[in-house]
Design a protein with these regions (language model features):
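Conserved acetyl-CoA-binding loop-helix of GNAT-fold acetyltransferases
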Residues: 98-111, 138
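A short, internal acetyl-CoA/4′-phosphopantetheine-binding micro-motif in the GNAT/acyltransferase core
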Residues: 90-97
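Conserved beta-strand in the GNAT
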Residues: 59, 65-73
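Conserved GNAT acetyl-CoA-binding A-motif
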Residues: 114-124
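Conserved beta-strand-loop-alpha-helix junction that forms the acyl-donor binding cleft
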Residues: 123-132, 144, 151-155
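A short beta-loop-alpha structural element at the N-terminal edge
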Residues: 8-20
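A short helix-loop-beta-strand connector motif used in the catalytic cores of GNAT acetyltransferases and
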Residues: 46-59, 86
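Conserved GNAT-fold acetyl-CoA-binding loop/helix
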Residues: 21-47
Length: 176
């Protein structure tokens, strides 16, 4: 990447859905979780540009070339009494890493958060991705080691939604 050309960041448009989808697939491949990336272009269009969008995306370009992206949504912190931004995905093409693309995406996200009165910017990182963790700490982010992320998907989510749980002591476990 030429040193005199910095990344340009802009919101994704509906016509960018194929580019966003391509980045999602590349991120899944990088994380060795391609099988989990079942998203389609129609899913991207509905989530980002449908009648009730649930997320937004930013694209980073170097010249005319897509260099990276971020997908994010707004959250709410009851403790702070303020909204926040959760960054679902952040990915930079390998050849553009180390050239300010990721930082430019995060700066843009922080600016959007400031404009909307957000009190925080949060994201998760795979625990083996030391390069990313070092980058995040270099910009001032702090790992939240006292928190553990839980997730319900598929059959477990369906069971809970249908009310099929039993109470055991102080914890709730799904029926088997």
């Amino acid at each position: 990447m030429p040193a005199d050309i910095g990344p340009q960041i802009r919101p994704a448009r509906e016509s960018d859905a194929p580019v966003v989808l391509d980045f999602i697939r590349k991120l899944a491949e990088y994380g060795d979780i391609s099988a989990e990336a079942t998203v389609t272009e129609a899913d991207v269009r509905a989530a980002l540009f449908g009648p009730r969008p649930v997320a937004e995306a930013l694209l980073a370009y170097v010249g005319d070339e897509p260099a990276g992206f971020a997908v994010f949504s707004f959250t709410f912190s009851s403790f702070m009494g303020k909204p926040g931004i959760y960054v679902e995905d952040l990915f930079v093409e390998h050849r553009f890493r180390g050239h300010g693309v990721g930082k430019a995406l995060l700066i843009t996200l922080a600016q959007r958060g400031r404009e909307r009165g957000c009190g925080r910017l949060e994201w998760s990182v795979l625990n083996w991705n030391e390069q990313a963790m070092e980058f995040y700490q270099d910009i001032g982010a702090v790992p939240m080691e006292e928190w553990t992320t839980f997730r319900l998907t598929g059959e477990a989510l369906e069971r809970l939604a249908s009310g099929a749980t039993i109470r055991i002591g102080l914890s709730t476990r799904a029926k088997t």
